[in-house]
Structures are given as C-alpha cells and as structure tokens.
Amino acid sequence: MHGRIVECVIPNKESRSYRCPLGVVAVISLWNFSFHLTQRSIAPTLALGNAVVVEPTSDTPVTGGVLIAKVFEEAGLPPDELNVIVGAGSQIGDEFVSHPIPSLISFTGSSIARILLAKRAAVNTSKTLFSSSVVPTHLVLTDADLKLAVHAAVVGKCLQQGQLCMVVNRINIEESIYDEFPPSSLIV
C-alpha cells in the first residue's frame, strides 16, 4: 500500500492518491467456474490487507467458498481474515449486502442482479465493485505462433462448453497476418 502525489494541471495545487485497505470486503460468489472466479476476488483483496466475507451461491458452496477458505487456512491465513457464509441468496442476500460492516461489496454477474445489489448496498453507502459478463477477445499479433494461436482460440471458445463468461467471443487478428490465419478456426 502506498500513496503518491500526482501532477496537477491547476497551478499551486497538488493531487494526492492514497492506496489503503478498506477493512472488510463482501464477495458474492458465482455458480459457474466458482473456484476460479471466487479466488480471483479473494486473493488480491486479502493481499491488500483486507478481511473477506464470502457468500457463495447455494449451488456451489464448497468450490465457491468453503474449499477456498480451507486452502487459505492451511496456507497460514490468520483466523477471521476469511469467512464464508453459506445459505440461499433469497434468505441471506439482502442482509449480506445491506450489512453496515463491509466497506466494499464485490459481485460478478448479471445486470439485473447488479442493480438490485447496488440499491441495497446504497443503504450503508458501501462501495461496490461489479464485474459484468465480458466479451473476451483473442488477440493475434504478427509475432504469434499461428498454430498455437489457433489452438488457443479453439480452447478459449470451447472451454467449459461455452458456459463461462470468459469464453472467447471475438478473435482479432493483426491485418498483416489475417490471410495466414486458418479460416476454419474463425468459424469456431
């Protein structure tokens, strides 16, 4: 964690930027690819000095929270730095996001759910960090190994039978090598 002074365009003024832990961060876990997506929120949050409370979806409480907590515990994470609350979102979700303790609520999911969560989090003016479905792009540049790039594009598109929000939906090929890229891989 650090701070810095950033150059300001206004004479005789300075802009300061401070990075510091927020305290407790609430993470709402997903059902699909839950281990990876949940730890992607937890690991950096803990590394920056925050405590985490995770509410895994009731469909995947083990891979979306309990197993991750066990891994961190075995790695030596101090007690109470990572907590898991298991239950149906319909029963505990409102209380989880409107609770006054979390300084930040992290959620990856649909637009409708984000809107509902933002309204509930606003009760305590909690900060929110929402990640929606993205459109991952497979980028192929002139120095790429084309055989490997084609393989990576196919794997990226077909991984998890396309049920993952990170599945490749677009392939961008640098114009100078476009004609060298096998057309069949573009159909995937």
Enumerate the predicted regions with their spans.
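A structured beta-alpha segment of the ubiquitous adenosine-cofactor-binding alpha/beta core
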Residues: 14-15, 83-106
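General beta-strand structural signal in soluble alpha/beta enzymes
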Residues: 54, 84-86, 107-109, 128-132
